[in-house]
């Protein structure tokens, strides 16, 4: 690889900024853009002016909904930042971003510590093995406790924090940070919005604590890095360079997480955090080869090195509609080069595509690029058939890269246009939005003919309906939210025999199948099909039809028509007719045998349970717990945090609609809550009876 390309890759960082809602993630990103010279005026989220939050709704709601990708420069390094949303309804955005990132900055709120969404995002990052550093933000706030936040990282996230900075002062007296790597104090000046800071000696009254924490830092890193361990055992004090190198190695191996602190809003601590991104987070070369598989053969591994000499390969991780250039596809290039106008293959769908323009994105401004190489994140225009998770590659060297997993929606509502004129526009709007967001699903209810949209939570669907109105001018009526129930079976039934025959002159239909049906023990969505037919009792070409028939029958359960999950079908035996058997006949037989078996297998209804965390003043604690119990909630834990009480519970989603209003009135607006999907569980018999009766229209 030419040295200039190598140094370009070594100087690239693809990072995400991840956190709980309100931990100050967007503000942190804004400061990064300001100090790296991209922005001339700092945007504030609470004023609705942040650059990264560029959809109108985000500015109104003060939360980040779509992960905008932005490029900036720091210390001669190119940093591509993906700002991810922290609200749990938008988990899919985080999941997508993590798939294409090399490293991440986890932002924590110094007052609240590690919150539920932080845990979710951290676990997602663990799954993709993303090295990360932590930034404890809001050190200027009343109740900020840096050390408690570090302890919570250990307890809740099972992390190994390597504390490399201590706060200098706290709350209103927060002045700067103490750098434990270089053993210096950093003080920020207020007159230039924190753009410069001075490095001073550590004041006397902080020296003892600084020394104690530096010893802890050396110990933590030495335990996770052999080279530093040798120095440590020999009693040698490592140089700054040696310590930085050891921290980098341990961070890249995901053994430690360097922890920094500051207050993005008060412009303190952002530049050292950028230094840490450059010093400790990986570049595309550190990540090494991307492993995919050959087209049509998942067993054959295909490797792509992060080099421009390799064939082109990239992953599309986000689709967005842009008012000026149409459909933008954000891609992460893993190998090779891409130039504007060149043909590429979408190997996931086996469709040829042509790339129009290549754009380097800054939250909502853009610059054209002639070409782009391995390790870069850009948006391209002109792709017609590509959706999230698809692989793009060189038509002469096809490969399919690992895609992403998206959770199934848990809530759905009926939507209908207000006027006939809106009908056409609604279809277009829904199609566009579904292209952008894989957790937003659309179907037509066959019985009522209504359009049903499904998503990850009430806020998620609110935002989508709002976008239809703003971006596509569609006025629509939205029904009450409905819960996505599921069905499953409790016991195994054997040798269910079904014969499908129709012989009324002309060519008839004939198929006989014998199946076993049993629970598969998965967690929602599982289906297995095993063929044990021997001796050609059913010709091989008809076996997939039986499978397809079973899968079709699963979509409408036998109790209340909800999808059936977690089952295993074993095809044991059957019969066919030389003339009258067909694929359709076996599909019908498979479907009917499945329904028959499901009725006998003790079917039950499942409902989504939400993990709910309520933060409340102590004097309202009894009301909150009583209310959760009345909603069929199971209290999991109670704890104290920063003068408030935290109640954690599992509550059925069906009981949580309108909770925000009830909670406000019960606690005079002093309590807050967050919730996220946890699991599916069996519905109690008395409740199930009502749901089934309602579904059957009784």
UniProtKB/Swiss-Prot annotation:
Cell compartment(s), UniProt: Cytoplasm
Example GO BP: ribosome disassembly
Binding residue positions for GTP: 19-26, 83-87, 137-140
GO cellular component: cytoplasm
Ranges of residues in domain tr-type G: 10-285
Pfam families assigned: EF-G_D2 (PF22042), EFG_C (PF00679), EFG_III (PF14492), EFG_IV (PF03764), GTP_EFTU (PF00009)
Keyword presence, Nucleotide-binding: yes
One example GO MF annotation: translation elongation factor activity
PROSITE patterns on file: G_TR_1, G_TR_2
Protein name: Elongation factor G
Annotated source species: Frankia casuarinae (strain DSM 45818 / CECT 9043 / HFP020203 / CcI3)
